[in-house]
């Protein structure tokens, strides 16, 4: 596409050079800029990428978007704008032909449950033989092909490229995990959503948002800004068991479908039965009551299942068809995932990293603990420490607790575990500044019949260490290796 055409919708301060050049790529990553690319520089929290403009020029890039004029060769066109990232969104959606308009787009937000609900929607679509894509904490997936990702919600250009990739692969729908960071930072500008789903709101990310009010406002942006295509039917799915849903009703102009277990809602779960093999319940709807069975464990997953079913139903699939699909869904990686049921202990990994998430996790597993519940939890570095003692208190619902760091980054691991220990309500806990050693200790003290829960990371494949270096780490692999060494079995499948 000709650059002059691309910039027709952009208000610029000035253009230094010519826009008469062909463009086939947009990037905010200086390492990928080349001839035919537009490089969009920005001032980030830690890095100002304007300093890489000379690098991209050396790589053959002939057009940069900047917030102030740079010292560059005369053959490099500079487009000076007030807000480079807002312009990046406009350019990306224009160049890639507004990809979110070309499929059904589901957006899932909330403190806990985003990954589970988003994955369930994707898996239901696949059971219905529909081409589907997913993007979130567990990476990027088109049908069954997976690649890893860095952020729950990528920056705006990368996000648009992923949606375009899904469209080109024939995806009929795409489900996005929508983070509060992504909403505030404008990463979702220009994305056309068809259905927005809310799970819950509890304390998290106050290191970024400052207050719960600001955090809640960030979440609400999804529901007030579903897009500009008024010809499409759009819906909002809210959890009535969370009081924040009342506020979300006031900010959205779209039709709302509510679900709940404890509070009255349009769609409800009654007569709940739970086991470590899954859940069953009566799904009470405006159209009748349906029996539902699912392999997912825990009462909180019933809420997630309802949210996913309603979202898919809202776009025209019958509930009977969806319920049949739900019976045979694959596990959501790293979410209340039981590792190797042949072991004499129940070894479980989960992503729960807030007090609310941990409470729900313990509620789910405690009824099925045969002997002791051993619970390992970590606290992330450079994050909101005000929530940490409460996490420690909740963890002490278990018989024995292990406190570790989780992505300590530049914080002292001993400080992080000490913050968790401030909330301890009994003395049956131990602190490890090395998470891997903490996991090995959990297995070492476990006896047949015990339940070992490794919380806060799920299948996250790294630890963020000093200097923000990512070191390979997998809770599931470390736990299984230690369990096979003690109890026999294996080998660990890498």
Curated annotation (Swiss-Prot):
Pathway: Cell wall biogenesis; peptidoglycan biosynthesis
Catalytic activity of the protein: UDP-N-acetyl-alpha-D-muramoyl-L-alanyl-D-glutamate + L-lysine + ATP = UDP-N-acetyl-alpha-D-muramoyl-L-alanyl-gamma-D-glutamyl-L-lysine + ADP + phosphate + H(+)
Binding residue positions for UDP-N-acetyl-alpha-D-muramoyl-L-alanyl-D-glutamate: 30, 152-153, 179, 187
Binding site for ATP: 110-116
Gene Ontology process terms (BP): cell division; cell wall organization; peptidoglycan biosynthetic process; regulation of cell shape
Gene3D superfamilies in alphabetical order: Mur ligase, C-terminal domain, Mur-like, catalytic domain, MurE/MurF, N-terminal domain
InterPro entries: Mur-like_cat_sf, Mur_ligase_C, Mur_ligase_C_dom_sf, Mur_ligase_cen, MurE/MurF_N, UDP-N-AcMur-Glu-dNH2Pim_ligase
Keywords, in A-Z order: ATP-binding, Cell cycle, Cell division, Cell shape, Cell wall biogenesis/degradation, Cytoplasm, Ligase, Nucleotide-binding, Peptidoglycan synthesis
Location of the protein in the cell: Cytoplasm
Top-level taxon of the source organism: Bacteria
GO CC aspect terms: cytoplasm
Motif L-lysine recognition motif boundaries: 406-409
EC identifiers of the protein: 6.3.2.7
PTM-bearing positions, type N6-carboxylysine: 219
PTM field: Carboxylation is probably crucial for Mg(2+) binding and, consequently, for the gamma-phosphate positioning of ATP.
A GO MF term: UDP-N-acetylmuramoyl-L-alanyl-D-glutamate-L-lysine ligase activity
SUPFAM superfamilies per UniProt: MurD-like peptide ligases, catalytic domain, MurD-like peptide ligases, peptide-binding domain, MurE/MurF N-terminal domain
Function: Catalyzes the addition of L-lysine to the nucleotide precursor UDP-N-acetylmuramoyl-L-alanyl-D-glutamate (UMAG) in the biosynthesis of bacterial cell-wall peptidoglycan.
PANTHER family (alphabetical): MUR LIGASE FAMILY MEMBER (PTHR23135), UDP-N-ACETYLMURAMOYL-L-ALANYL-D-GLUTAMATE--2,6-DIAMINOPIMELATE LIGASE MURE HOMOLOG, CHLOROPLASTIC (PTHR23135:SF4)
Protein known as: UDP-N-acetylmuramoyl-L-alanyl-D-glutamate--L-lysine ligase
């Amino acid at each position: 596409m000709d650059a002059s055409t691309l910039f027709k919708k952009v208000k610029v301060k000035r253009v230094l050079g010519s826009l008469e050049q062909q463009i086939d790529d947009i990037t905010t990553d200086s390492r990928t800029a080349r001839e035919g690319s537009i490089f969009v520089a920005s001032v980030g929290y830690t890095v100002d990428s304007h300093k890489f403009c000379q690098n991209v020029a050396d790589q053959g890039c002939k057009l940069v978007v900047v917030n102030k004029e740079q010292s560059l060769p005369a053959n490099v066109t500079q487009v000076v704008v007030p807000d480079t990232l807002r312009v990046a969104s406009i350019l990306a959606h224009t160049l890639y032909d507004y990809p979110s308009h070309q499929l059904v787009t589901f957006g899932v937000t909330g403190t806990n449950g985003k990954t589970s609900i988003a994955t369930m929607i994707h898996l239901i679509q696949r059971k219905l033989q529909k081409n589907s894509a997913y993007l979130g904490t567990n990476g990027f997936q088109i049908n069954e092909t997976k690649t890893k990702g860095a952020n729950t919600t990528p920056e705006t250009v990368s996000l648009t490229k992923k949606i375009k990739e899904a469209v080109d692969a024939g995806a009929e729908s795409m489900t996005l995990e929508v983070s509060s960071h992504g909403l505030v930072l404008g990463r979702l500008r220009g994305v056309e959503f068809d259905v927005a789903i809310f799970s819950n709101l509890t304390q998290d990310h106050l290191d970024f948002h400052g207050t719960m009010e600001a955090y809640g406002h960030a979440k609400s942006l999804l529901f007030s800004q579903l897009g500009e295509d008024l010809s499409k039917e759009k819906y909002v799915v809210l959890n009535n068991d969370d009081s924040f849903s009342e506020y979300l009703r006031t900010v959205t102009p779209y039709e709302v479908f509510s679900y709940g277990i404890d509070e009255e809602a349009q769609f409800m779960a009654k007569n709940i039965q739970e086991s470590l093999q899954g859940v069953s319940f009566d799904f009470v709807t405006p159209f009748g009551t349906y029996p539902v069975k699912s392999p997912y464990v825990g009462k909180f997953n019933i809420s997630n299942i309802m949210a996913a079913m309603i979202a898919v139903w809202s776009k025209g699939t019958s509930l009977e068809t969806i319920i049949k699909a739900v019976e045979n869904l694959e596990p959501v990686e790293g979410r209340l995932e039981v590792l190797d049921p042949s072991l004499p202990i129940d070894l479980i990994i989960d992503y729960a990293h807030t007090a609310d998430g941990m409470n729900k996790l313990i509620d789910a597993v405690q009824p099925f603990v045969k002997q002791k519940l051993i619970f390992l939890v970590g606290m992330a570095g450079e994050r909101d420490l005000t929530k940490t003692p409460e996490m420690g208190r909740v963890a002490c619902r278990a018989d024995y607790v292990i406190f570790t760091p989780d992505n300590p980054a530049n914080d002292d691991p001993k400080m992080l575990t000490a913050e968790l220990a401030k909330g301890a309500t009994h003395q049956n806990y131990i602190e490890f500044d090395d998470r891997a050693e903490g996991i090995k200790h959990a297995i070492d003290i476990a006896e047949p019949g015990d339940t070992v829960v490794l919380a806060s990371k799920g299948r996250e494949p790294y630890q963020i260490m000093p200097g923000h270096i990512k070191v390979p780490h997998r809770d599931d692999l470390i736990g299984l290796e230690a369990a096979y060494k003690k109890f026999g079995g294996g080998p660990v499948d890498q």
